[in-house]
Amino acid sequence: MRILLIHSYYQQRGGEDSVFEQEYELLKQSGEIRKITFKNHSGWRGALQFIYSVWNTRAAGKVRQMIYEFKPDIVQVYNWNYASGPVIIQIAKKLGVKVVVNVQNYRLLCPSASLLHNGKLFTDSIEKRGFPWKAVRYRVYRNSFFQTFWLAFVVYFHKIAGTWEMVDQYIAPSNTVKKLFTEYKSYTDIPKEKFLVKPNFSIQTGILIRKREKHFLFIGRLSEEKGIDFLLDTFKNSSYDLIIAGNGPLKDKVLEACAQHSNIRFAGNLDKEKVKEAMSICTALIFSSIWYEPFGLVITEALSNGCPLIASDIGSPAELVAEGVNGIHFKTGDKESLQNRLDYWQNLGEAEKERYSFNCVSSFNELFTPEKNREQLLSIYHSLVNN
């Protein structure tokens, strides 16, 4: 089977980039595979990319040429915004190739792509059918009226052009994503039957056996949607220690909190081995996202390393973290709830914490290994090709 993967890299690396790279490496072991990548630029080049994203003839030509040469059975699209634009879907479909779209955000539901605005959930775009004028008025994308409008217009234009209906299969990484796309209104009107769930995966490289310390750990992008403000406010008034690792727009706020509160420490941006080590010695990892997190690769990384989780109770964390099994939940964005759960966790005996750790590895092996993922992907591809 011949498979062509297409992805537009973000300016700041994120989870979607990792998903693309991991699945590319995974599929290399299962058939002939090629990839086409684009890069989102900043400045005037980025502005031109953004404007041309409604119908990017250059990207279309690049994809068309690869399909002529490679003759793939499947084209799988990851991120199309904004370097390639959705036109690549039309090109593949018109050349007779089965098209799969990997949905790792909510851009087809709302121009915010996160259903979050000013630190709060913004669901107007999925509660009302039609063009998302309220989202445009509120400037939910980069606080820009024009950019929000244009992104919404690109999605709406391709609805009118029939692009979204040309996709043979949409893959959602969690039931949360599938539910938001299939049970709520949207201005794309994608048929429900085209969605299925296939979780992302992590690569387990062996578990480090370390004596766990008493501090908590946060690893991830230092940004609004990850609940950084709420997390810092909780630990500013807590006696427990917190180590924060990552990078992002709220890094300065994290450094300021570290300077003022000795129980909060910043570890910087860690490589894979350092992440593994950090997860092996903390008492638990805190996943504090305040939005409908589509998946959360750091959760599967924690599970693979036997690191219990204390997670918010909406989005994919509500699915991936099983209460009382491999972690516990707190009410999203609620400082008192998080503090109560921190107290609960620290009052557990060591044997009980070890049970959680053992269950983490069991959960990972059951659901999130590369082998499971390869099996699921190939099953999807074969089903499409055979039909």
Where are these regions (language model features)?
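Nucleotide-activated donor-binding/catalytic signature segment of Leloir-type glycosyltransferases, i.e.
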Residues: 253-273
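Short alpha-helical segment that forms part of, or immediately flanks, the ligand-binding pocket
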Residues: 276, 299-304, 318-319, 325
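Short alpha-helical donor nucleotide-sugar binding micro-motif in glycosyltransferases
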Residues: 269-270, 277-282
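Short hydrophobic beta-strand element within catalytic cores of glycosyltransferases
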Residues: 308-311
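A conserved mid-protein helix/loop that constitutes part of the nucleotide-sugar donor-binding site
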Residues: 17-18, 214-237, 249-252
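A charged, aromatic-enriched C-terminal amphipathic alpha-helix characteristic of glycosyltransferases
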Residues: 351-382
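Conserved acidic donor-binding segment of nucleotide-sugar-dependent glycosyltransferases
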Residues: 323-324, 328-335, 344-350
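Donor nucleotide-sugar binding/catalytic pocket of nucleotide-sugar-dependent glycosyltransferases
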Residues: 131-206
